[in-house]
Amino acid sequence: MARFYRRRKFCRFTAENVAYIDYKDIDTLKQYITENGKIVPSRITGTKARYQRQLALAIKQARYLSLIPYTDNHK
């Protein structure tokens, strides 16, 4: 039987000693949004709760200011 080993999740913001997640950093924010525009949960990304709250707030601010779209797949 083969066992599947998952890579350990870690918080990227803690590793890089980020003090505050900026809503103007679009490249970072897009890594935490699905292709449908939803915010990826921390249980999948491994982000700590403190940074997940900052991340959600930054994404919502960027959406409001039209820096990133609410949804990507308009047809």
From Swiss-Prot:
This is Small ribosomal subunit protein bS18. It comes from Acinetobacter baumannii (strain AB0057). It holds the Pfam family Ribosomal_S18. InterPro entries: Ribosomal_bS18, Ribosomal_bS18_CS, Ribosomal_bS18_sf. GO terms for biological process: translation. Keywords: Ribonucleoprotein, Ribosomal protein, RNA-binding, rRNA-binding. It comes from the Bacteria. The keyword Ribosomal protein applies. Belongs to the bacterial ribosomal protein bS18 family. Part of the 30S ribosomal subunit. Forms a tight heterodimer with protein bS6. GO terms for cellular component: cytosolic small ribosomal subunit. GO terms for molecular function: small ribosomal subunit rRNA binding; structural constituent of ribosome. Binds as a heterodimer with protein bS6 to the central domain of the 16S rRNA, where it helps stabilize the platform of the 30S subunit.
